[in-house]
Amino acid sequence: MKGTIIKGIGGFYYIKIDNSEEIIECKARGKFRHTELTPMIGDYVEISIDKNNKGAIEKIYERRSELFRPAVANVTQALVVFSFKNPDINIDLLNKFLLLCEYNNLKVIVCFNKMDLVNKEDYKDIISMIEQAGYDIIFLNAKEERNMDIIKKLIKDNVTVFCGPSGVGKSTMLNKIIGKETMITGNISEKLKRGKHTTRHSELIYVDEGLLVDTPGFSSLDINFMEKEDLLYCIPEFRDFIGECKFTGCLHHREPNCAVKKAVEEGHIHKNRYDFYIKTLEEIMNRRKKKW
């Protein structure tokens, strides 16, 4: 049998079987202890059931993506949620979330919540910056369910994580989407008599033919793992200019005849995005110097 790990507690994994609402409790085979591969929420797996009706994970299929905070495999898209007011938008923070999503190869949709508090025209430069970078934007008022129908359609056939700073309404959005009646995993603890009083872990929730990670993504915004070569490919609007600079391996920093810098001057790349890139690049380079 094959299915998806939707929850893991204390060495037990709960697998939702394909084309069924059946959830089977499994342990991982001992062979996984001798490899670097540990089962994760979101893993697509093959399982077996023994004569005592005990489940075991036999195989973990190749992951399309892998997040670490929260630890979830095979996420396909991120809804990056911000507000312009309450709390006020922090452009660098928004860019950092976008950077982490790109690093993890996630499709990104930017959601601006609490639109009832602001006039969109006052923020047209920020909106233009995001659109210029190639991201779709959805304007929301989650409390009043404005445009939440669009979000629900996006979730279908995807594994979706919500991310963004505190206070922007991620939990409200999740609650509006999930609703108690759709929570297939909601009664696992009761049914299996395990997990009720354990530390809370991420889990996947099936809703509208899609999967939601039930805890906000990127609880850490640390980018210490990133190298300058990674950074180059995490700013999507730079990609059109790769190979057009004078120097191979151009970092678009102090090098002359740089196609990216020219694109910034001509308005094809937003200056805020370029400034964020330079600031992040210098952080990475300074960290590397300290290492040595």
From Swiss-Prot:
<keyword id="KW-0479">Metal-binding</keyword>
<comment type="function">
    <text>One of several proteins that assist in the late maturation steps of the functional core of the 30S ribosomal subunit. Helps release RbfA from mature subunits. May play a role in the assembly of ribosomal proteins into the subunit. Circularly permuted GTPase that catalyzes slow GTP hydrolysis, GTPase activity is stimulated by the 30S ribosomal subunit.</text>
</comment>
<dbReference type="InterPro" id="IPR004881">
    <property type="entry name" value="Ribosome_biogen_GTPase_RsgA"/>
</dbReference>
<keyword id="KW-0342">GTP-binding</keyword>
<dbReference type="GO" id="GO:0019843">
    <property type="term" value="F:rRNA binding"/>
</dbReference>
<dbReference type="InterPro" id="IPR031944">
    <property type="entry name" value="RsgA_N"/>
</dbReference>
<dbReference type="InterPro" id="IPR012340">
    <property type="entry name" value="NA-bd_OB-fold"/>
</dbReference>
<dbReference type="GO" id="GO:0042274">
    <property type="term" value="P:ribosomal small subunit biogenesis"/>
</dbReference>
<comment type="similarity">
    <text>Belongs to the TRAFAC class YlqF/YawG GTPase family. RsgA subfamily.</text>
</comment>
<dbReference type="GO" id="GO:0046872">
    <property type="term" value="F:metal ion binding"/>
</dbReference>
<feature type="binding site">
    <location>
        <position position="250"/>
    </location>
    <ligand>
        <name>Zn(2+)</name>
    </ligand>
</feature>
<feature type="binding site">
    <location>
        <begin position="113"/>
        <end position="116"/>
    </location>
    <ligand>
        <name>GTP</name>
    </ligand>
</feature>
<dbReference type="Pfam" id="PF03193">
    <property type="entry name" value="RsgA_GTPase"/>
</dbReference>
<keyword id="KW-0547">Nucleotide-binding</keyword>
<feature type="binding site">
    <location>
        <position position="252"/>
    </location>
    <ligand>
        <name>Zn(2+)</name>
    </ligand>
</feature>
<protein>
    <recommendedName>
        <fullName>Small ribosomal subunit biogenesis GTPase RsgA</fullName>
        <ecNumber>3.6.1.-</ecNumber>
    </recommendedName>
</protein>
<keyword id="KW-0378">Hydrolase</keyword>
<keyword id="KW-0690">Ribosome biogenesis</keyword>
<dbReference type="Pfam" id="PF16745">
    <property type="entry name" value="RsgA_N"/>
</dbReference>
<dbReference type="GO" id="GO:0005737">
    <property type="term" value="C:cytoplasm"/>
</dbReference>
<feature type="binding site">
    <location>
        <begin position="164"/>
        <end position="172"/>
    </location>
    <ligand>
        <name>GTP</name>
    </ligand>
</feature>
<keyword id="KW-0963">Cytoplasm</keyword>
<comment type="subunit">
    <text>Monomer. Associates with 30S ribosomal subunit, binds 16S rRNA.</text>
</comment>
<keyword id="KW-0699">rRNA-binding</keyword>
<dbReference type="GO" id="GO:0003924">
    <property type="term" value="F:GTPase activity"/>
</dbReference>
<dbReference type="GO" id="GO:0005525">
    <property type="term" value="F:GTP binding"/>
</dbReference>
<keyword id="KW-0862">Zinc</keyword>
<dbReference type="InterPro" id="IPR010914">
    <property type="entry name" value="RsgA_GTPase_dom"/>
</dbReference>
<dbReference type="InterPro" id="IPR030378">
    <property type="entry name" value="G_CP_dom"/>
</dbReference>
<dbReference type="InterPro" id="IPR027417">
    <property type="entry name" value="P-loop_NTPase"/>
</dbReference>
<feature type="binding site">
    <location>
        <position position="258"/>
    </location>
    <ligand>
        <name>Zn(2+)</name>
    </ligand>
</feature>
<feature type="binding site">
    <location>
        <position position="245"/>
    </location>
    <ligand>
        <name>Zn(2+)</name>
    </ligand>
</feature>
<feature type="domain" description="CP-type G">
    <location>
        <begin position="64"/>
        <end position="221"/>
    </location>
</feature>
<keyword id="KW-0694">RNA-binding</keyword>
